[in-house]
Design a protein with these regions (language model features):
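Positively charged
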Residues: 1-136
Length: 136
């Protein structure tokens, strides 16, 4: 189900709770909402659709990927950039990393670890900021 985009900064500033297997329908809604906004959006966190759970979805080189309970294990190559967000107006300056190593769970809640770089690393970090209640 495609959901409305949450623009409530007080809600967006809350840290997300860990995702559980019963949150799979939320992930499906998140993915459907992301695809519906694909012309202006490459990633979303569950709080962007009004659910404070640690779930992100984004477009990668291999298609769309959903991560449950993602965390950054390692990061390198800090730099400053400017980003926009469907939940916020305009663009804002923020710090990002050239390379990040991420641990997450897939839709079967099996652990995964992968290193991402460039644009994909930026997207993941932006969505993880949402999960951590950080507003760019």
């Amino acid at each position: 189900m495609i959901r409305d985009i949450c623009k409530d900064e007080l809600f967006l500033a809350r840290k997300a709770a860990p995702a559980l297997p019963e949150d799979l329908p939320i992930a499906q809604d998140l993915l459907e909402t992301l695809i519906a906004h694909k012309d202006g959006c490459v990633g979303m966190a569950a709080n962007m659709i009004g659910v404070a759970k640690r779930i992100i979805a984004f477009e990668s080189e291999d298609g769309y990927l959903v991560m449950f309970n993602p965390v950054i294990l390692k990061k390198s190559g800090p730099y400053e950039t400017e980003e926009g967000c469907l939940s916020l107006t305009g663009t804002r300056k923020t710090k990002r990393w050239q390379t990040i190593k991420v641990q997450w769970q897939n839709e079967k809640f099996q652990p995964r670890i992968k290193t991402f770089s460039g644009w994909t690393a930026d997207i993941i970090k932006h969505e993880l900021d949402h999960c951590d209640g950080i507003i760019i």
